[in-house]
Amino acid sequence: EVDCNPAICPYAKGHFDRVNDAVYDLLQKENNMTREVLLAHAKEYQVCPFEMCLDTATWADNIIFDYNYVFDPNVYLKRFFADGIKGDYIFLVDEAHNLVERGREMYSAALVKEDILAVRKIMKPRSSAIEKELGKCNKLMLEYKRECETYQIYESIPNLIFSCMRLAAKIEEYMQKNPEFPGRDVVLDFYFELRNFLNIYERVDEHYVIYGQHDEEGRFVIKLFCVDPSFNLQECLDKGNATIFFSATLLPVQYYKELLTNKTDNYAVYARTTFSQDKRLLLIGNDVSSKYTRRTPEEYGRIADYIYRTITVSYTHLTLP
């Protein structure tokens, strides 16, 4: 895990004294700024590679990055997509069928009762005011928990939200005055989750469902779930001039058109494959899986063996178990 504290990270210490020279040198020498090139220059100048990458991006014609740098309300690149900023951008979204679920995740939030108790234990000997607010928050969560056997939908949760707002303000004030204390990382993570919960609640409308449930670990969770992310995604898409969604699996297309954007005048283009189906050979290795629970060295080895045998022998001699 990266710690951006200048007292710990040599790349963070004095970063701003050296980064301008690093960016200038990079722009003079390189046209294709790959990960390897950026890391090499960052190491040479002892600057933060991530921050240098962001600075360099303002000179780039094409930028390749993950969805979250455009769509995630917590980590989007503010230098490009801050409120009120519209750029001369064209968004090319690959594997767009994944954006629906990712959009739901990015615009949803959860509050876990057990996390409140964990932070309360840390803060009890340090701040009676915070411990008291955590107790109020926990009491409200307990009331919701008693209503919930397995799954419970709530129309609204105003009392909990007001309690969370008071709690977030007190934690923020305490951490500004106390930069170091045992358990600070746990409290900081909880604070960010709490802030995200409050920020997402401001977006809650008819496209959301608020519900409580017991998760797989038995913890009680209240979730602000974004069922339809199209309006939130559209806010981001409006920061550019146009968007093209690519995917080989955007079917049924009307489903994706309705959940990826709230515009009604979008159109779909079906592109035929350039490969002849007469030359297609379908081979199935049914002893391997890409499921997360099956991702082991042995599984990787079997998959790699299939790939190797496929590219090194004629298909007429390829046998599968």
Range-by-range predicted roles:
Residues 33-35, 279-292, 311:
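Gly-rich Lys/Arg/Thr-decorated short loops/hinges at beta-loop-alpha junctions or inter-strand turns
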Residues 291-315:
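Conserved interdomain hinge at the start of the Helicase C-terminal
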